[in-house]
Swiss-Prot record:
InterPro entries: Ade_phspho_trans, PRibTrfase_dom, PRTase-like, UPRTase/APRTase. Its EC number is 2.4.2.7. Homodimer. This is Adenine phosphoribosyltransferase. It is found in: Cytoplasm. SUPFAM superfamilies: PRTase-like (SSF53271). Its main location: cytoplasm. One of its GO terms (cellular component) is cytoplasm. It catalyses: AMP + diphosphate = 5-phospho-alpha-D-ribose 1-diphosphate + adenine. GO terms for biological process: adenine salvage; AMP salvage; purine ribonucleoside salvage. Catalyzes a salvage reaction resulting in the formation of AMP, that is energically less costly than de novo synthesis. It comes from Myxococcus xanthus (strain DK1622). Belongs to the purine/pyrimidine phosphoribosyltransferase family.
């Protein structure tokens, strides 16, 4: 189990995040309320505090690679990798990487999708943290974790800026492996 995220007791950070996150109704489809993180990214002090808080539980966990899930996971994962002195690996939609890659498919409500990484992105035994902005159902994160395992990595955990707990993502991934700053 990961230590508690320091910022969860930092009511100022939580309040600042809640003030800056923007709800966009009916995006990308009618009935969905999209959590827009771009106002957080636009504020350098707040963005820095977010990266510090997201990386804090994993300091001392010997993370060697941080996998950022396309696309907003890149924006959080790369600076978290720097903060942890780890390498960064992008997990992309199939067909987007230039070198030989490995794909992991997963089911959606209506159809399927996939995530891919370069076949040499993670070495045997590397300790890997998976990062994304929002945890919803957990399908993409779960597929990314399977891909990490197929490539020989050891999953340290998952880290998200926010979790939509009503969609059951933390239960799917295993709550003890999931760290988030905000829960909705």
């Amino acid at each position: 189990m990961h230590p508690p995220v320091p910022s969860l007791t930092d009511t100022t950070l939580v309040a600042d995040l809640n003030a800056r996150l923007r709800d966009v109704p009916d995006f990308p489809k009618p009935g969905i309320v999209f959590k827009d993180i771009t106002p957080v990214l636009a504020d350098p002090r707040l963005f820095g505090r977010v990266i510090d808080a997201m990386s804090a539980p994993f300091r001392g966990q010997h993370v060697t690679k941080v996998v950022g899930v396309e696309a907003r996971g890149f924006l959080l994962g790369a600076p978290i990798a720097l903060a942890l002195n780890a390498g960064f690996v992008p997990a992309r939609k199939p067909g987007k990487l230039p070198h030989r890659s490995v794909v992991e498919r997963y089911s959606l409500e209506y159809g399927s999708d996939g995530v891919e990484m370069h076949e040499d992105a993670i070495l045997q035994g590397e300790r890997v943290l998976v990062v994304d902005d929002v945890l919803a159902t957990g399908g993409t994160a779960e597929a990314t974790a399977r891909l990490v395992s197929r490539l020989g990595g050891e999953l340290v955990g998952f880290c998200f800026l926010l979790s939509l707990d009503f969609l059951e993502g933390p239960n799917r991934l295993g709550r003890e492996r999931v760290t988030t700053l905000l829960t909705f």
